[in-house]
Amino acid sequence: MAAPSLKTTSRGKETILLVEDEEIVRTMIVTLLSRHGYQILETSNGEDALRTSDRYDGHIHLLLTDVIMPGENGYAVASKLRARRPELKVLFMSGHMDSAIVQKILSDPRNVFLRKPFKPTALAQKVREVLEGSPSQ
Protein backbone atom coordinates (compact mmCIF):
# COMPACT_ATOMS: atom_id res chain seq x y z
CA MET A 1 0.00 0.00 0.00
CA ALA A 2 1.32 3.45 -0.91
CA ALA A 3 2.06 5.95 1.82
CA PRO A 4 -0.43 8.80 2.10
CA SER A 5 0.68 11.79 0.11
CA LEU A 6 1.55 15.01 1.86
CA LYS A 7 0.05 18.26 0.70
CA THR A 8 2.47 19.65 -1.85
CA THR A 9 3.21 23.27 -2.46
CA SER A 10 3.01 24.62 -5.99
CA ARG A 11 6.32 25.13 -7.72
CA GLY A 12 7.35 28.67 -8.40
CA LYS A 13 9.33 30.42 -11.07
CA GLU A 14 9.33 33.90 -9.58
CA THR A 15 12.33 35.90 -8.38
CA ILE A 16 12.72 36.41 -4.64
CA LEU A 17 15.05 38.92 -3.00
CA LEU A 18 16.12 37.35 0.30
CA VAL A 19 17.56 39.46 3.12
CA GLU A 20 18.80 37.35 6.05
CA ASP A 21 21.85 38.10 8.17
CA GLU A 22 22.23 34.62 9.70
CA GLU A 23 24.18 32.52 7.21
CA ILE A 24 22.79 29.14 8.28
CA VAL A 25 19.20 30.40 8.00
CA ARG A 26 19.93 32.11 4.68
CA THR A 27 21.48 28.93 3.25
CA MET A 28 18.49 26.83 4.36
CA ILE A 29 16.03 29.27 2.77
CA VAL A 30 17.99 29.48 -0.49
CA THR A 31 18.19 25.68 -0.71
CA LEU A 32 14.51 25.19 0.06
CA LEU A 33 13.13 27.86 -2.25
CA SER A 34 15.51 26.95 -5.09
CA ARG A 35 14.20 23.39 -4.90
CA HIS A 36 10.72 24.83 -5.30
CA GLY A 37 11.79 26.50 -8.54
CA TYR A 38 12.29 30.09 -7.39
CA GLN A 39 15.21 32.27 -8.48
CA ILE A 40 16.82 33.67 -5.33
CA LEU A 41 18.77 36.92 -5.07
CA GLU A 42 20.64 36.29 -1.82
CA THR A 43 21.73 39.16 0.45
CA SER A 44 22.84 39.38 4.07
CA ASN A 45 21.84 42.94 4.96
CA GLY A 46 19.64 45.85 3.95
CA GLU A 47 22.33 47.85 2.18
CA ASP A 48 23.25 44.86 0.01
CA ALA A 49 19.55 44.24 -0.74
CA LEU A 50 19.07 47.81 -1.97
CA ARG A 51 22.19 47.55 -4.14
CA THR A 52 21.08 44.19 -5.54
CA SER A 53 17.64 45.56 -6.36
CA ASP A 54 19.14 48.59 -8.11
CA ARG A 55 21.46 46.42 -10.21
CA TYR A 56 18.89 43.76 -11.09
CA ASP A 57 17.06 44.57 -14.33
CA GLY A 58 14.43 41.84 -14.03
CA HIS A 59 11.21 41.71 -12.07
CA ILE A 60 11.53 40.98 -8.35
CA HIS A 61 8.27 39.37 -7.28
CA LEU A 62 8.87 39.07 -3.54
CA LEU A 63 11.05 40.53 -0.82
CA LEU A 64 11.58 37.91 1.91
CA THR A 65 13.28 39.72 4.75
CA ASP A 66 14.34 39.19 8.31
CA VAL A 67 13.21 42.08 10.50
CA ILE A 68 15.97 42.36 13.10
CA MET A 69 19.39 42.72 11.45
CA PRO A 70 22.54 44.79 11.89
CA GLY A 71 22.21 48.12 10.08
CA GLU A 72 18.79 48.82 8.64
CA ASN A 73 15.94 46.66 9.84
CA GLY A 74 13.76 44.72 7.42
CA TYR A 75 10.87 47.17 7.73
CA ALA A 76 13.05 50.10 6.61
CA VAL A 77 14.46 48.05 3.73
CA ALA A 78 10.96 47.03 2.63
CA SER A 79 9.77 50.65 2.71
CA LYS A 80 12.65 51.78 0.49
CA LEU A 81 12.23 48.89 -1.94
CA ARG A 82 8.46 49.41 -2.16
CA ALA A 83 9.12 53.04 -3.13
CA ARG A 84 11.41 51.84 -5.95
CA ARG A 85 9.31 48.82 -6.94
CA PRO A 86 5.66 49.51 -6.08
CA GLU A 87 4.53 46.08 -7.29
CA LEU A 88 6.87 44.32 -4.83
CA LYS A 89 5.25 41.89 -2.41
CA VAL A 90 6.85 41.49 1.01
CA LEU A 91 7.04 38.68 3.54
CA PHE A 92 8.62 39.60 6.89
CA MET A 93 10.12 37.00 9.23
CA SER A 94 11.49 37.20 12.76
CA GLY A 95 11.77 35.33 16.02
CA HIS A 96 11.93 38.53 18.08
CA MET A 97 8.24 38.91 18.83
CA ASP A 98 8.77 41.47 21.60
CA SER A 99 10.61 43.91 19.33
CA ALA A 100 8.89 47.27 18.75
CA ILE A 101 9.49 47.07 14.99
CA VAL A 102 7.93 43.58 14.83
CA GLN A 103 4.92 44.89 16.74
CA LYS A 104 4.65 47.77 14.25
CA ILE A 105 4.69 45.29 11.35
CA LEU A 106 2.08 43.09 13.02
CA SER A 107 -0.20 46.08 13.68
CA ASP A 108 -0.65 46.70 9.94
CA PRO A 109 -2.96 44.07 8.42
CA ARG A 110 -1.38 44.62 4.98
CA ASN A 111 1.88 43.14 6.22
CA VAL A 112 2.49 39.40 6.01
CA PHE A 113 4.63 37.87 8.74
CA LEU A 114 6.15 34.46 9.44
CA ARG A 115 7.43 33.71 12.92
CA LYS A 116 10.82 32.04 13.30
CA PRO A 117 11.59 29.27 13.77
CA PHE A 118 9.40 27.86 11.03
CA LYS A 119 9.13 24.53 9.28
CA PRO A 120 10.34 24.46 5.68
CA THR A 121 6.85 23.54 4.49
CA ALA A 122 5.38 26.54 6.32
CA LEU A 123 7.83 28.87 4.58
CA ALA A 124 7.16 27.38 1.14
CA GLN A 125 3.40 27.64 1.65
CA LYS A 126 3.54 31.21 2.96
CA VAL A 127 5.75 32.33 0.04
CA ARG A 128 3.28 30.82 -2.42
CA GLU A 129 0.32 32.47 -0.64
CA VAL A 130 1.95 35.89 -0.75
CA LEU A 131 2.94 35.54 -4.40
CA GLU A 132 -0.60 34.55 -5.35
CA GLY A 133 -2.15 37.34 -3.27
CA SER A 134 -2.61 41.03 -3.96
CA PRO A 135 0.36 43.45 -4.24
CA SER A 136 -0.55 45.06 -0.92
CA GLN A 137 0.37 41.85 0.90
Short names for language-model regions:
Residues 1-17, 104:
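Disordered, acidic interdomain junction associated with two-component signaling
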Residues 20:
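Conserved acidic carboxylate
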Residues 26, 70-71, 98:
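The feature encodes the CheY-like receiver
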Residues 27-35:
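Charged docking surfaces used in two-component/phosphorelay signaling
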Residues 37-44, 52, 114:
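Short hydrophobic/Thr-rich beta-strand motif most characteristic of the beta2 strand and flanking loop
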Residues 45-48, 70-77:
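Acidic catalytic/metal-coordinating carboxylates
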Residues 57-64:
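Active-site beta3 strand of CheY-like receiver
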Residues 66, 94:
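Active-site residues of response regulator receiver
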